[in-house]
């Protein structure tokens, strides 16, 4: 391999103006779920101009191939593209121009980083000892994009042997650009959506005796569900049950017929037995409490996303490669987490259950940079000075891993 880590980092830094332009254009025009026409257009146009032949994958994904001129393995590099359905209040000069939508998780950063990596890899395509598959994924926030692209053939033609993703972190008191590398095993929780519909009998607020109040029942259900963690799970078992949305009625003087709540269940049990227990008890508790208040309760679950599983040998590769590229800018994530999985979830986990995978994080600004809020907050900011490091990290990982797996001494 003729390129060194220092040279690749220098080439990536030269891309900063373009990286920032891509990121800020995407940030101004956020799109959510699978409905990403403008985002896809930007990605495909940029890839085509670099010399790639981008292809659609699944409902709204884009893939492209680099290398393939030499026999060897295939490594997948992934960036998610979708935004969140929340209003932006960051104060950035390039804030969202779309009411009620915002890139509040940094997926605009990821997309720009992978486009930068695509440019670097195209420039060094003759040095790739195998193939790099670039994945631009929709619908991560609803945990549907990854399984959809897998069903669309993401991991085949050519078959993927390893997979890599990076996620930016905002609001963390870490040096900007620090890459956090996990130690292997389960690193992120599973997640599942739940929906509870409590049905009663509506009427005038002045005559509750003639009604069956679903709000009272739903409120008691919500409180009772919080006892599952403390009374039903073994000490040490990780389980988080959160109700994030509660709706009932439309007028202050009317008892409604229906009250509803939506939320999530998160566990770190790879076999999901903890999740099964929580689901069973949720249903029993909701229906039992509802009956005590003369109501009925319907409980449903959807959009299950498994735990993220990081391949230990690949994580060891990652630590070596990121140290080569960034020196002390690479950090063992277990120093922060104690080796315990995080409670967040990521739908790239579907890939991690099929091929060896590593998911890393990049510190994208903390309080010193004015990035005082974390992901999914309307005021969150990301320091896009780290974009070139993300591009270089993607590119260097691919180059080095293909070399290592071609049996060539570095």
Over which residues does each language-model region extend?
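Electropositive phosphate-/nucleotide-binding environments in soluble metabolic enzymes
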Residues: 2, 6-9, 13-20, 33, ...
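Divalent metal-coordination and catalytic microenvironments
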Residues: 26, 64, 77, 107, ...
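Histidine/acidic-residue-rich, glycine-tolerant segments that coordinate divalent metal ions
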Residues: 84, 91-102, 109, 121-256, ...
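Histidine-centered active-site/metal-ligand motif
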Residues: 27-29, 103, 107-110, 167, ...
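Non-cysteine beta-strand/loop elements that form the S-adenosyl-L-methionine
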Residues: 76-78, 87, 194-196, 359-364
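Metal-dependent amide/peptide-bond hydrolase catalytic core
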Residues: 219-410
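Acidic/His- and Gly-rich active-site-bordering loop/insert found
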Residues: 2-103, 108, 112-129
């Amino acid at each position: 391999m003729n390129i060194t880590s220092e040279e690749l980092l220098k080439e990536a830094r030269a891309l900063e103006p373009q990286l920032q332009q891509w990121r800020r254009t995407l940030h101004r025009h956020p799109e959510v779920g699978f409905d990403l026409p403008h985002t896809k257009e930007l990605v495909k146009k940029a890839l085509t101009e670099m010399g790639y032949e981008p292809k659609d994958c699944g409902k709204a994904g884009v893939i492209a191939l680099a290398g393939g001129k030499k026999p060897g393995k295939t490594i997948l590099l992934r960036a998610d593209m979708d935004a969140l359905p929340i209003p932006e209040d960051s104060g950035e000069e390039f804030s969202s121009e779309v009411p009620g939508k915002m890139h509040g998780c940094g997926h605009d950063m990821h997309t720009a980083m992978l486009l930068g990596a695509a440019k670097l890899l195209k420039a060094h395509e003759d040095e790739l000892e195998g193939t790099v598959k670039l994945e631009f994924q929709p619908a991560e926030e609803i945990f549907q994009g990854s399984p959809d692209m897998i069903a669309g053939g993401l991991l085949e033609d050519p078959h993927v042997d390893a997979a890599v993703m990076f996620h930016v972190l905002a609001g963390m008191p870490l040096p900007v650009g620090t890459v956090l590398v996990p130690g292997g095993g389960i690193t992120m929780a599973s997640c599942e959506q739940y929906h509870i519909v409590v049905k009663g009998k509506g009427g005038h607020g002045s005559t509750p005796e003639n009604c069956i109040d679903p709000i009272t029942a739903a409120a008691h259900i919500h409180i009772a569900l919080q006892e599952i963690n403390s009374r039903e799970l073994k000490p040490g078992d990780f389980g988080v049950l959160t109700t994030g949305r509660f709706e009932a009625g439309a007028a202050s003087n009317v008892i409604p017929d229906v009250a509803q709540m939506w939320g999530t269940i998160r566990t770190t049990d790879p076999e999901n037995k903890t999740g099964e227990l929580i689901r069973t008890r949720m249903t029993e508790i909701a229906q039992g409490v509802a009956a005590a208040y003369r109501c009925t309760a319907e409980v449903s679950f959807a959009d299950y996303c498994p735990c993220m599983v990081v391949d230990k040998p690949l994580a060891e590769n990652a630590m070596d490669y990121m140290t080569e590229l960034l020196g002390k800018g690479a950090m063992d994530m277990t120093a922060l987490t104690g080796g315990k999985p995080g409670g967040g979830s990521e739908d790239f986990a579907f890939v991690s259950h099929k091929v060896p995978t590593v998911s890393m994080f990049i510190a994208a600004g903390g309080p010193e940079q004015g990035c005082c809020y974390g992901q999914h907050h309307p005021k969150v900011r990301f320091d896009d000075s780290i974009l070139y490091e993300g591009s270089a990290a993607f590119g260097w990982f691919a180059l080095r891993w293909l070399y290592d797996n071609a049996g060539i001494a570095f």
